[in-house]
């Protein structure tokens, strides 16, 4: 079981330069959300796409790997 797993995630950048991630959370370690709840993170401090990790001020999330479709 992967903690704080975000599925079907997207990255959003706001006019002020802040970046957030939206997605469905599973295995929330702080028990804030039931599995499958759509959330928006607080401002992202760090993203590692290779490791699939997002860090905000108070949380670490794991990004579910997505397939890349190429034509």
Kindly label every feature range from the protein language model.
Residues 1, 16-17, 47-52:
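Generic structural signal for short, solvent-exposed loop/turn connectors between secondary structure elements
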Residues 1-2, 59:
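Terminal low-complexity, poorly structured segments
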Residues 18, 42-43, 59:
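Generic serine detector
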Residues 24-55:
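Acidic, low-complexity, intrinsically disordered interaction modules
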Residues 46-71:
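Short, compact, well-ordered microdomains
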